Amino acid sequence: VDSAAAVASFAPGTHGEPFTVEALLQNCDDTEMGPSCTFYAEGARWVASFGYKSNDAALEYMKTLPVNAPMIVSGDQISMGDITVEAAVSKAEPGQRDAYADQRDAMQGDWVDESDAKSTLRVVGSEETASYDGQQTAVSVLGFADACPGGDSIGPVVWKQEMGGDPMDTPCFALLAVSPTRMELSYVGRGNTLVYVRP
């Protein structure tokens, strides 16, 4: 790790509301904001652009990491949309794997609904793309916790928030079983179980 990545490049509050979050790397790529790194923390999608207020050494460090790598990221919030935060990253360093890392890892990749082969999911990092008969239907952010938003602790759950959807609409599923070959989710509040297998 370039030591400059872990040294704050500006004082907290320089560019907006300061933050320090435990984050998961999504990717570093060209986005709607130019070359940038995207990470997930606290249920939001955070985007930091190269050459714009951030510590580029910290973003270069992110570029070396695999998807879902845990990080501790500090900086300032420049602006916030529905679920996307434009961030100025001051520093980034390695974080600890969280309690849901194994389930998150097992969920990565392509899945087919056992009861309807036209219904598919692709999980990459903290993003899930749902498709039906080859047509993309939704892209959602996945969050892992031991309780649904506003609910009781019931053990590991995954909640989904559709990008561009209602921020209050977060369907939540109990993780009944997640292995590299099979995923069983129970829709909390509706009770139906969804089973996905590998294609």
Regions found by a protein language model. Name each.
Residues 1-8, 69-71, 75:
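A general sequence property marking short-to-moderate contiguous segments
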Residues 2-40:
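Structural detector for short beta-strands of small beta-barrel domains
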Residues 14-16, 62-64, 92-112:
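N-terminal helix-cap/turn-to-beta initiation motif at the start of protein domains
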